[in-house]
């Protein structure tokens, strides 16, 4: 008998499909994003150890006043510059994997990824 996943929402199924396709290994760290209508969150995760190495969001004290509870292109620029600052301070020698979660690679998600790529990070 076939296993049923009817208890999961479509976005949860999409997120699980995307995460299954990612290259999760010791030499790759995962950049995971989450967005809501008011905030945008980014984490750098080591899947082998199961820990978050660093994170940035619209709730950080440095950019909270600029964001004002809205997620738009300006907010994404601020969060990406904060994440680049934190990643460059870590001096990463490992490659990165971009985890878009259940979100399509358009709009704000692609703007964030391109901002990281333009700063010299490869994924």
Swiss-Prot record:
A Gene Ontology biological process term: translation
InterPro entries: Ribosomal_uL18_bac-type, Ribosomal_uL18_bac/euk
Keyword rRNA-binding among UniProt keywords: yes
Pfam families recorded: Ribosomal_L18p (PF00861)
GO molecular function, one term: 5S rRNA binding
Transmembrane segments: none
UniProt KW keywords: Ribonucleoprotein, Ribosomal protein, RNA-binding, rRNA-binding
A GO cellular-component term linked to this record: cytosolic large ribosomal subunit
Keyword check for Ribosomal protein: yes
Subunit architecture: Part of the 50S ribosomal subunit; part of the 5S rRNA/L5/L18/L25 subcomplex. Contacts the 5S and 23S rRNAs.
Family membership: Belongs to the universal ribosomal protein uL18 family.
Annotated function: This is one of the proteins that bind and probably mediate the attachment of the 5S RNA into the large ribosomal subunit, where it forms part of the central protuberance.
Protein name: Large ribosomal subunit protein uL18
Originating species: Wolbachia sp. subsp. Drosophila simulans (strain wRi)
